[in-house]
């Protein structure tokens, strides 16, 4: 009953909905999703940062190394021995970045198995040409196909 995600009257449980839809200049730009529990909102943000801050296309944004924070006090638990949780990173995250995160007090673990980093799919519409571009997850089975 002391878990932050326990069902109680008037309380909304921590839950994320997979699909996301982005509009730009009042036109549809991209529908996408990244399944994977608590990785969903983290993955959504990482995809958007990769595209809009780093200029990656939808496939590059999905293929880029990801991070996944698990544990800690919010939103899904951990006791006093786990106040910060663990930041899992893929091998593609530079050692310099890992060291900087550790120097800031984060507990970082490099994880080679990509399954914990979610599963991503996207359909992107080029605003200038109207051409649709598909992207799919390289960490899991998936296929982007069109005609």
Language-model regions: role of each:
Residues 1-114:
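Proteins synthesized as precursors that undergo proteolytic processing into mature forms
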Residues 95-147:
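In a subset of proteins, long, contiguous C-terminal domains/tails are tracked
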């Amino acid at each position: 009953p002391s878990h932050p995600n326990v069902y109680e009257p008037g309380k909304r449980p921590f839950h994320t909905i997979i699909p996301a839809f982005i509009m730009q200049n009042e036109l549809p730009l991209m529908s996408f999703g990244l399944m994977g529990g608590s990785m969903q909102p983290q993955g959504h943000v990482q995809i958007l940062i990769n595209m809009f801050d780093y200029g990656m296309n939808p496939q590059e944004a999905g293929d880029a190394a990801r991070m996944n924070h698990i544990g800690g006090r919010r939103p899904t638990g951990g006791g006093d021995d786990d106040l910060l949780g663990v930041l899992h990173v893929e091998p593609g995250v530079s050692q310099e970045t890992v060291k900087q995160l550790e120097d800031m007090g984060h507990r970082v673990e490099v994880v080679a198995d990509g399954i914990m980093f979610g599963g991503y799919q996207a359909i992107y519409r080029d605003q200038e040409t109207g051409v649709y571009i598909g992207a799919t997850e390289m960490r899991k089975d998936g296929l982007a196909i069109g005609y």
